[in-house]
Curated annotation (Swiss-Prot):
Gene3D superfamilies: 1.10.287.1480. This is Small ribosomal subunit protein uS14c. Belongs to the universal ribosomal protein uS14 family. HAMAP family: Ribosomal_uS14_1. Keywords: Chloroplast, Plastid, Ribonucleoprotein, Ribosomal protein, RNA-binding, rRNA-binding. The gene is rps14.
């Protein structure tokens, strides 16, 4: 199980991403339309002033059951350990363990 502080940090990042996404998108669109170098620098400065954790690149997917960040399966929102256990128990609809 991941530390609670790490899980809370990721939740904080998700909140910041959703809060600043419109502003960040607007600045990036403006950056594409502007042609002068000085204007681009000014827009980059505005982007840099946004909180660092509001960037979607800093978000890390985590398993909703354990908080584990590695070996994460997007389709299920689970890490490989939990996915395997739940598949064995038949808790994931439509998923069966193969055997031959």
């Amino acid at each position: 199980m991941a530390k609670q502080s790490m899980i809370q940090r990721e939740l904080k990042r998700e909140r910041l991403i959703s809060k600043y996404s419109a502003k960040r998108q607007l600045l990036k669109e403006e950056l594409k339309t502007v042609s002068s170098y000085n204007d681009k620098l000014a827009i980059y400065k505005k982007l840099e002033k946004l909180p660092r954790n509001s960037s979607p690149n800093r978000h890390r997917n985590r398993c909703w059951a354990t908080g584990r960040s590695r070996a994460y399966y997007r389709d299920f929102g689970l890490s490989r350990h939990v996915l395997r256990e739940m598949a064995h128990e038949g808790l994931i609809p439509g998923l069966t363990k193969s055997s031959w």
